[in-house]
């Protein structure tokens, strides 16, 4: 069992990483007998994990209600959020309730935002079941739902009480979802840790094969890096946390334009990271050699390195200008400077961005 702390003063919380965690009543120790819990999951995960987690909670004499949502990015919406509120109210959940997000990034983001809003804020616990959620979205308190005009546009910074990573969940993860999570893993190496990037180059085959030792190390290192960044810049005020958005400005444009769920988040971020690398090259701030290292590693993870074939470069910028990093009408992009380091830039001309996107086309739709 591994434990990492996200250090935020009184709001600090643990990330626990272990196999079989969902079967362990002691893992829910902060909850007390008789307390209410609302388990939020989706129709795909409910048959796999809902009964197991409910039984574990009931062993600890915790009162459990559940809400089962449709599965998919397109359901990370205000209307589905309202379904969670309705379930809480119909079951008379009061301010001392705890919401548990049992799922991937969609469930975690939506449940966290529900917790931030319900009766002005209730406790919630992240139980991430996808690699992407385990290494990234479950840690750091970013909660949100999507809007037709943009991804994660309606949300709040709201930290969980704890994050419980059960490595056994990866055994049921579809290959495409595993690759999607690996995009966020690779991102950490590009922006923060060149040694970790090199380790990924040496161990990608083991990760794809779900080697226990390699995967445990990978998840632990990603959570350590994310925890350090969140502790230093929780609400993206200094620019440090914004570096975690490498590839996301391009990637969110792809997700929004193509329709939520057509491209998985990690797939869009993967193509976006190559676009960011090409942009950095065009301003002579990144090497072709490092770009090729990124492309090779993404391809080994079975990820796209080009944008959608039917999305022209001019379709990107309107979405990118709605990005949450835009300030005073200026596009701000996270660009790598070398493997292991990145900068937040606000001086990139739009024609440079378009030229970089052009270099990353075409790609057959997924």
Swiss-Prot record:
It holds the Pfam family DHQ_synthase. One of its GO terms (biological process) is amino acid biosynthetic process. The keyword Transcription regulation does not apply. Pathway: Metabolic intermediate biosynthesis; chorismate biosynthesis; chorismate from D-erythrose 4-phosphate and phosphoenolpyruvate: step 2/7. Its main location: cytoplasm. NAD(+) binds at residues 71-76, 105-109, 129-130, 142, 151, 169-172. It is found in: Cytoplasm. Catalyzes the conversion of 3-deoxy-D-arabino-heptulosonate 7-phosphate (DAHP) to dehydroquinate (DHQ). This is 3-dehydroquinate synthase. It comes from Photorhabdus laumondii subsp. laumondii (strain DSM 15139 / CIP 105565 / TT01) (Photorhabdus luminescens subsp. laumondii). The gene is aroB.
């Amino acid at each position: 069992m591994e434990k990492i702390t996200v250090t935020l003063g009184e709001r600090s919380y643990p990330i626990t990483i272990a196999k079989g965690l969902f079967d362990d009543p002691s893992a829910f120790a902060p909850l007390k007998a008789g307390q209410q819990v609302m388990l939020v999951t989706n129709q795909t995960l409910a048959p796999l994990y809902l009964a197991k987690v409910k039984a574990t909670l009931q062993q600890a004499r915790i009162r459990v209600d559940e809400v089962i949502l449709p599965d998919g990015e397109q359901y990370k919406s205000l209307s589905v959020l309202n379904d969670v509120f309705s379930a809480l109210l119909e079951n008379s959940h009061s301010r001392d309730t705890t919401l548990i997000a049992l799922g991937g990034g969609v469930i975690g983001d939506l449940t966290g935002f529900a917790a931030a809003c319900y009766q002005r804020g209730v406790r919630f616990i992240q139980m991430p079941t996808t690699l992407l959620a385990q290494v990234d979205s479950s840690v750091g308190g970013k909660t949100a739902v999507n809007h037709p005009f943009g991804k994660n546009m309606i949300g709040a910074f709201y930290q969980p009480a704890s994050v419980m990573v059960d490595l056994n969940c990866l055994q049921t993860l579809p290959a495409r979802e595993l690759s999607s999570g690996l995009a966020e893993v690779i991102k950490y190496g590009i922006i923060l840790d060149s040694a970790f990037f090199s380790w990924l180059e040496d161990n990608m085959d083991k990760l794809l094969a779900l080697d226990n030792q390699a995967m445990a190390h990978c998840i632990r290192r990603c959570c350590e890096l994310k925890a350090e960044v969140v502790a230093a810049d929780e609400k993206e005020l200094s620019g440090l946390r914004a570096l975690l958005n490498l590839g996301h400005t391009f990637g969110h444009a792809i997700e929004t334009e193509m329709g939520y769920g057509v491209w998985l988040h990690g797939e869009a971020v993967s193509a976006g990271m190559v676009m960011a690398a090409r942009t950095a090259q065009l301003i002579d701030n990144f090497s072709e050699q490092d770009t090729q290292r990124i492309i090779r590693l993404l391809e080994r993870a079975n990820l796209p390195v080009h944008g959608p074939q039917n999305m022209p470069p001019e379709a990107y910028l309107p979405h990118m200008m709605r990005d949450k990093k835009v300030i005073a009408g200026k596009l701000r992009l996270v660009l790598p400077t070398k493997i292991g380091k990145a900068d937040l830039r606000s001086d990139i001309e739009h024609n440079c961005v378009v030229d970089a996107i052009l270099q990353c086309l075409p790609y057959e739709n997924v």
